[in-house]
């Protein structure tokens, strides 16, 4: 089956500009909040294939979206490596066994992805059955650098002094960690592809913390390794891959040279500028400021039309926000967004 989302990433003809939204299955939906209560806690929600399917399908059932994204968390990999992931209400993710010594990096185990992360591939199988070819399914991972920031800091951070200190003081150990994570991620994404995801995305949430040389050495190098390591053809279909470095507008050319099919943009770069810079090489995803969804429906329509009018051509653009949708957005405003994108981009 031909999907506009896949075709846009591969620069094939589309009937309209496809749209999906980062965190489209999430707390802004009342049905998600009900499922979250039923699960008891966030990790249980992630680790139950049936519940993960339920929340993945909620935005697909409610809105006319062009893709579903697997409901999971980027930190499932470090959890499987023995770091002990847990969540505190209002504080985000924490690790009970962070990488706070050089020896802890050396001794870090490489999990058997097929066994220890089987709940993720099981969820993909359940979701694919539920989707019944209505829309494609996106698999994903965090980038090695982004995973490393949480693993070394022990959770979220305001200034990231531990991980950046390790990078500057002991780059050999940092590279050892990133290389190990890259190998695991390749296995992880290939596992998702083998059970049915139609495309994959790498979220480099914290790549924008770095300067140009550090970004190339400690983030982009390893994402490029992953791009080269995953199955790009499977079961007769092409599996496109999208990279997203939040705060990465200055490195668009380098990201586009990684071999990826799509580059996701945050809202700090103009879409027409990005298209001039890299549009000949890759498809673009983005890039409405998530806070626009707090505005009136009329303003949402106006801002969406601005972005759509910036893009030149009939394919190669996937509409999205420049980051995840906020938890307190009115779901009706999400519906306005989706409907307006389709209305104004119909070929």
From Swiss-Prot:
GO terms for molecular function: uroporphyrinogen decarboxylase activity. GO terms for cellular component: cytosol. It catalyses: uroporphyrinogen III + 4 H(+) = coproporphyrinogen III + 4 CO2. GO terms for biological process: protoporphyrinogen IX biosynthetic process from glutamate. Belongs to the uroporphyrinogen decarboxylase family. HAMAP family: URO_D. Homodimer. PANTHER family: METHYLTETRAHYDROFOLATE:HOMOCYSTEINE METHYLTRANSFERASE RELATED, UROPORPHYRINOGEN DECARBOXYLASE. This is Uroporphyrinogen decarboxylase. It comes from Ruthia magnifica subsp. Calyptogena magnifica. The gene is hemE.
